[in-house]
């Protein structure tokens, strides 16, 4: 029995009517995962016993008619702490780490009777754009197994796109939810910085990281954000926002909405076929009653350079805690304290992580701090001001999520600069702390294209409104890869 084609609302109806039990749904999800796992490699760990036991307890209590997420299984990126379930960040450094606490996002999900089904593969410590830097395996794109799934949340995206799970959580530091969502033809939201607690998220870039949901449809995405959003005393950067119902504007028309299309998002480095796809999407918004006008974000071209200084600097600080002393991997050949530190970090971290630690340490060093880290912070402010100017006159910004469709496995993983440039269109959103979503907008060369919608801070409801309006006029979200039972 496979239930992966049912929406969350449909599953809730089946659970309420007792046509299926939470345990049966969980078992069906585990079966869907196992049937596809050899082909795509989405998961690092399956929490089979724990998930089935939790489902039994939910069945015993009964499904809450007012809680659409009651009894729903979901997958979790492996840098989000789950008590009693391995949380490796896809690194040798944490290959055996089992947290003794849950991330706040997981606690919130458990409070709504959701079931963690397993932990998904990712780029090591979320550093990468293809899920190829994982210590454990390379995840494959759901549509074409010779292509990358994007990164760093590639496992979470592929798990949803291939029909293994209906929902998953990822994290987004420079595009790590939106880019894999685009590459796999699903919906991925990076909420406003501070909307979802970072407590229990293994830190990469603390001023940039944000947890967010993956889903098949816009409404399901908003339903999962409803669960995980909210302020948290355990996270000093958590925003004191009142949780709205993020589904409340879905279904409302967008007549009169003013949408901006930055010329920089369709310029150099963008595949001409993707440009054409996005211009068609813009026409669709106009048919729905919105106005779409060209604008400029002049400093966005510096986003990648700024990001790789700031994110790497923050990472070099955050990753100092992994030294072989308290938890995780420890080098066995070390004889002195210094050797424990040096050998553990040399052996425990992969090449990309070490590259970024060195880059960040250099940027923060006394002779270069002003020229690099301080200057990057100043340019970041200019990028933020560009967005503020546009949002003074417009409701939303649209553009491509990525400059190309999914690229081939083993094509860019030895070319760091080209890999970094794949985040050209997503990075500015993180630098400014804004919400951004990627939704399916068609296909180029048989591979999915993502349309990115960006709003001012705390405008997730508006983004979901526009995204759902676009989705309702297309069938891209209904088209599925062969592995999910589709024709493509």
Curated annotation (Swiss-Prot):
GO terms for molecular function: ATP binding; glutaminyl-tRNA synthase (glutamine-hydrolyzing) activity. Keywords: ATP-binding, Ligase, Nucleotide-binding, Protein biosynthesis. GO terms for cellular component: glutamyl-tRNA(Gln) amidotransferase complex. Gene3D superfamilies: Amidase signature (AS) domain. It is an enzyme of class 6 (ligase). Its EC number is 6.3.5.7. It catalyses: L-glutamyl-tRNA(Gln) + L-glutamine + ATP + H2O = L-glutaminyl-tRNA(Gln) + L-glutamate + ADP + phosphate + H(+). SUPFAM superfamilies: Amidase signature (AS) enzymes. The keyword Protein biosynthesis applies. Coiled coil: none annotated. Pfam families: Amidase (PF01425). GO terms for biological process: translation. The active site is at 77 (charge relay system), 152 (charge relay system), 176 (acyl-ester intermediate). Heterotrimer of A, B and C subunits. HAMAP family: GatA (MF_00120). NCBIfam families: gatA. Allows the formation of correctly charged Gln-tRNA(Gln) through the transamidation of misacylated Glu-tRNA(Gln) in organisms which lack glutaminyl-tRNA synthetase. The reaction takes place in the presence of glutamine and ATP through an activated gamma-phospho-Glu-tRNA(Gln). Belongs to the amidase family. GatA subfamily. This is Glutamyl-tRNA(Gln) amidotransferase subunit A.
């Amino acid at each position: 029995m496979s239930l992966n084609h049912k929406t969350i609302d449909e599953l809730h109806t089946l659970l309420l009517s007792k046509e299926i039990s939470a345990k049966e749904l969980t078992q069906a999800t585990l079966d869907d995962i196992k049937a596809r796992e050899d082909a795509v490699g989405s998961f690092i760990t399956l929490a089979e016993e724990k998930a089935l036991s939790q489902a039994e307890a939910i069945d015993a209590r009964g499904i809450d008619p007012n809680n659409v997420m009651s009894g729903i299984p979901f997958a979790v990126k492996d840098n989000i702490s789950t008590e009693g379930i391995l949380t490796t960040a896809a690194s040798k450094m944490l290959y055996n780490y089992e947290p003794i606490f849950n991330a706040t996002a997981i606690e919130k999900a458990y409070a709504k009777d959701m079931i963690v089904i397993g932990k998904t593969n990712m780029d090591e410590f979320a550093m990468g754009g293809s899920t190829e830097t994982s210590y454990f395996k390379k995840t494959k794109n759901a549509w074409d197994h010779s292509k990358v799934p994007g990164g760093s949340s590639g496992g979470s995206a592929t798990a949803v796109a291939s029909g293994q799970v209906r929902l998953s959580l990822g994290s987004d530091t420079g595009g790590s939810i939106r880019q894999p969502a685009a590459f796999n033809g699903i919906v991925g939201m990076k909420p406003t910085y501070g909307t979802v607690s970072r407590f229990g998220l293994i830190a990469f870039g603390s001023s940039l990281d944000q947890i967010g949901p993956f889903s098949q449809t816009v409404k399901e995405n908003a339903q999962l954000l409803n669960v995980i959003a909210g302020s948290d005393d355990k996270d000093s950067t958590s925003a004191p926002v009142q949780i709205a119902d993020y589904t409340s504007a879905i279904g409302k028309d967008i007549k009169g909405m003013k949408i901006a299309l930055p010329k920089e998002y369709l310029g150099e480095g963008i595949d001409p076929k993707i440009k054409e796809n996005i211009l068609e999407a813009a026409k669709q918004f106009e048919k729905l009653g919105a106005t779409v006008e060209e604008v400029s974000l002049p400093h966005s071209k510096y986003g990648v350079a700024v990001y790789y200084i700031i994110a790497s600097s923050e990472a070099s600080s955050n990753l100092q805690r992994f030294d072989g002393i308290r938890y995780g991997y420890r080098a066995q050949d070390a004889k002195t304290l210094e050797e424990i530190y040096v050998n553990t970090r040399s052996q425990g971290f992969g090449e990309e992580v070490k590259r970024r630690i060195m880059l960040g340490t250099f940027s923060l060093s006394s002779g270069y701090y002003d020229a690099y880290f301080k200057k990057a912070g100043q340019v970041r402010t200019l990028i933020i001001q560009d967005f503020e100017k546009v949002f003074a006159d417009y409701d939303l910004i649209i553009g491509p999520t990525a400059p190309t469709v999914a690229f081939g496995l083993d094509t860019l993983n030895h070319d760091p600069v080209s890999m970094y440039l794949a985040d050209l269109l997503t990075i500015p959103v993180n630098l400014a702390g804004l919400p951004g979503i990627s939704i399916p907008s068609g296909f180029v060369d048989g591979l999915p294209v993502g349309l990115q919608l960006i709003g001012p801070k705390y405008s997730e409801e508006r983004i979901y409104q526009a995204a759902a309006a676009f989705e309702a006029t297309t069938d891209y979200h209904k088209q599925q890869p062969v592995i999910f039972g589709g024709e493509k």
